[in-house]
């Protein structure tokens, strides 16, 4: 057991890929370090962590009801400052609010490691913002990114060195959870079944998928079912589009599921339509269950995971016509699609669970 004290900064915990990696990494580290603490406002996720992890959150229940992201970061920064004042020899691993966390840590002369989760192109618009990000990021003791493409972005935009570690993929856990029984009659054997899993926000761009399936309904006689699993601000907009275009019988939107894998197991193909990512876990999960992946060529991650089209179908970002063509290709070319799936599945060895977790251990113990 290593004597260092590790503090993980993550103001808001949701159900996305970042959080899945958080649970895996934190629980692994708790078996190797004397003390692991997590600062977050999301008390409801406390049970997802090992019991020996110290969960630090605001005592007032008021913070559970607040949805404002900046306020949640602010209260967690206050809790972080308190920890840094009263405890010595702390090493901080930041999953969210990286710039703010870095500033606080450097003020108190604490070591901080930033884990960057989303492509620079998605949030670095604006000259001043880039300068500010570059200046603060240089203060960090280390920056971790989760794809080679992501690492190249940091070098190109900021000339910053980063440590590249792929997401640790627990294939056994995914397969185990996919076998849990669900009462789900939406998919039919005689239809082509598709799924999208992700937050219903602009970044994930689910409206593009709906537009492509509208084309499929108008231009072909193929029978299809599309399930979208997720929660977010764009839900009403998506439902309105479905109703307006009479797609209710073919497309279903359902709320976020703690365990989406039984639904993923029942589908034929997974679609990712994002305009930016980091390294989308959900593609790894789809390949683990041997499903064809149809993904946008957004920065960063999808092209790298899918071996630039050898392990899945890639369409031009924000182009519903190209996505439509890829859907048609999948429907018409079963044997070629199966070959893509085999290649994609075999390439999952890059995301080795133990190997990638050990990389985090080395960094935090250095």
Write out the residue ranges for each language-model feature.
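Carbohydrate-associated surface elements
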Residues: 149, 168
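Aromatic "clamp/platform" in nucleotide-sugar-dependent glycosyltransferases that forms part
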Residues: 256, 275
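N-terminal strand-loop element at the rim of the active site
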Residues: 8-68, 150-155, 234
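Short acidic/histidine- and often glycine-rich active-site loop of Leloir-type glycosyltransferases
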Residues: 285, 298-309, 313-314
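Short His-centered aromatic/hydrophobic patch
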Residues: 93-100, 116-117
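Conserved acidic donor-binding segment of nucleotide-sugar-dependent glycosyltransferases
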Residues: 307-320, 329-335, 349
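A conserved mid-protein helix/loop that constitutes part of the nucleotide-sugar donor-binding site
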Residues: 16-24, 192, 196-217, 233-239, ...
């Amino acid at each position: 057991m290593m004597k260092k004290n590790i503090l993980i900064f993550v103001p808001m915990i949701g159900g996305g890929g970042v959080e899945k990696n958080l649970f895996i990494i934190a629980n692994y580290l708790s078996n190797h370090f004397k003390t692991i603490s997590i600062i977050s406002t999301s008390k409801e996720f406390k049970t997802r962590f090992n019991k020996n992890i110290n969960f630090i959150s605001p005592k007032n229940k008021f913070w559970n009801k607040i949805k404002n992201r900046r306020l949640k970061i602010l209260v967690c920064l206050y809790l972080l400052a308190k920890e840094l004042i009263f405890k010595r020899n702390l090493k901080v691993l930041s999953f969210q609010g990286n710039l703010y966390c870095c500033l606080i840590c450097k003020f108190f002369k604490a070591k901080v490691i930033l884990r960057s989760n989303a492509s620079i192109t998605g949030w670095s618009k604006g000259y001043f913002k880039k300068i500010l990000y570059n200046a603060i990021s240089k203060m960090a003791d280390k920056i971790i990114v989760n794809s080679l493409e992501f690492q190249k972005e940091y070098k190109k935009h900021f000339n910053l060195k980063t440590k590249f570690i792929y997401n640790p993929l627990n294939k056994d856990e995914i397969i185990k959870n996919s076998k849990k029984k669900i009462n789900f009659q939406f998919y039919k054997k005689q239809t082509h079944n598709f799924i999208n899993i992700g937050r219903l926000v602009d970044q994930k761009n689910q409206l593009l998928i709906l537009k492509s399936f509208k084309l499929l309904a108008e231009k072909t006689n193929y029978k299809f079912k599309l399930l979208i699993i997720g929660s977010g601000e764009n839900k009403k907009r998506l439902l309105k589009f479905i109703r307006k275009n009479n797609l209710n019988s073919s497309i279903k939107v359902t709320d976020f599921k703690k365990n989406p894998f039984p639904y993923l197991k029942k589908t034929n193909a997974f679609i990712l339509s994002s305009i930016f990512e980091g390294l989308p876990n959900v593609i790894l999960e789809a390949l683990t269950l041997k499903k064809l992946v149809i993904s946008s060529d957004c920065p960063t991650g999808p092209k790298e995971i899918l071996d630039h089209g050898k392990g899945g179908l890639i369409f031009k970002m924000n182009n519903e016509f190209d996505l439509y063509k890829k859907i048609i290709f999948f429907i018409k070319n079963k044997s070629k699609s199966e070959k893509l799936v085999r290649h994609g599945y075999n390439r999952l060895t890059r995301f080795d669970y133990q190997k990638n977790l050990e990389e985090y251990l080395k960094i935090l113990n250095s």
